[in-house]
C-alpha cells in the first residue's frame, strides 16, 4: 500500500481554511442531477497496481516485437541499433524537460544542443541552414511546400510518384484548406527504376510551379540523381524540395543540397530514435540561407553578450508564431526536442567515419539480401540502384503473404497493397528494408519462408 500524504485531518484543515464544510461544497455550481453519486453501474472496482501490470504484460505478449523476429520493415521507419549511451545522455535532468528555451540566460545548454543539432543536419543535407526540428518527416514535407509558395508566390506543387503515400495524404489534407494545387501520381514497378517518374516531373514543371517534391531514396527504395531536376526547376523559377526518410543513406550517397535542392526535409527517426510505435519522431528541415526568413520552426543562433562572451539564443523569431498568425511562417509551436537531441547524440557518437561505415554495412546487407530473395522462384527484383531498401514483385498479392510470414514470427516487409489500397498493379509489391540489425541467418529465414509461401 503506497503512502498518500493526504489524511482526513489534512483534508479537514484545508476545507476549514477556505471556509467549506465538505468536499461537496466545492461543487455547488454543478447541478445535483449532473453529479456522480456512488459507483458507476457495471464498472468494476479498480485493480491493484500489481494486477494491472500483470494484465498489461499478458496483452504485450500478444505482440511480435521488432527485437524478437527477423525484421525487414521500412518504408519511412527503420530499425537501427541505438547505443545505450544515447538514452543515458538524453535522460539527464538538464535535457529531459518540456521547457522551451525562451529564456536564454537559463537555457544555454539546451540552446547549444539545438545549435549543434542544426549544424549536423545542415552538413548532412548539404544545406546552409537548418532549424531546430519539426514534428516529423510528413509535417516537415508539407511545411516545405508552403515555404515554397511563400518564396515563389506560386501555388502549384508537383509531387513525385515515389513520395511516401502518407506524406502525400497529409499534403492533400492540408491543401484542402490552403488552396494549394497538388499534382500527384502513384508509382509503378518499372524494373530498374521503380517509382522513378523523372520524365513526368521534368515535363510538368512550368511557370506556375512553386516546387517539385521528390523523395530520395524513394518509397520503393530507388536512388536517383536529382541534378537535372534541380536545374529544370531553377530554369522555370521553381524550387526543388528533396525528402529523405532514411538519413543513414547520406553516409553513402550525395546529399540533396549537393545535387541542387533548395529545401531538404526528412525524417530523422533512423538515427538515435527507436520505432516507438510510430512516434514521437523528429522532422528535419534545412534550406539555402537566402530563404531562411521563410523557413518554419525555431532557429537557435549564436551571438555575443555585452561582455563579449559567446551565447546561444532563439533567433529570427519574427518569422514564427510570436507574431500575427497570418504573418507567421509556421504555426507549429513546438518540436520533438528530446528526439532531436537523441539524433544529435547518436550522430556525434558515429562521427563521419562511423556514419559512412554504418551506411556501407546497410548497403552491403541489402545487396546480399536482394540477391538471395531474387533467387526465390517467381520473385522479381525490380530495383537497379538502391541503398538499404528494395522492392520485390511477387507472383501473387503480397499482403496475405506478409500476414502469413508474421504468423510464423517473421516481419518480412511492407506490402504495397497496404500503402496503395485499390491499386491492383501494385498489389504484388513487397518493400524489404535491410539494416545492420538483420543477420545473414535472418535473410535466409525470410528467403525460405517466402519460397514456401509462394509455392503453397
Curated annotation (Swiss-Prot):
Its EC number is 1.4.4.2. GO terms for biological process: glycine decarboxylation via glycine cleavage system; nucleoside metabolic process. It is an enzyme of class 1 (oxidoreductase). GO terms for molecular function: glycine dehydrogenase (decarboxylating) activity. It comes from the Bacteria. Keywords: Oxidoreductase. The keyword Iron-sulfur does not apply. It catalyses: N(6)-[(R)-lipoyl]-L-lysyl-[glycine-cleavage complex H protein] + glycine + H(+) = N(6)-[(R)-S(8)-aminomethyldihydrolipoyl]-L-lysyl-[glycine-cleavage complex H protein] + CO2. InterPro entries: GcvPA (IPR023010), GDC-P_N (IPR049315), GDC_P (IPR020581), PyrdxlP-dep_Trfase (IPR015424), PyrdxlP-dep_Trfase_major (IPR015421), PyrdxlP-dep_Trfase_small (IPR015422). The glycine cleavage system catalyzes the degradation of glycine. The P protein binds the alpha-amino group of glycine through its pyridoxal phosphate cofactor; CO(2) is released and the remaining methylamine moiety is then transferred to the lipoamide cofactor of the H protein. Belongs to the GcvP family. N-terminal subunit subfamily. The glycine cleavage system is composed of four proteins: P, T, L and H. In this organism, the P 'protein' is a heterodimer of two subunits. This is Probable glycine dehydrogenase (decarboxylating) subunit 1.
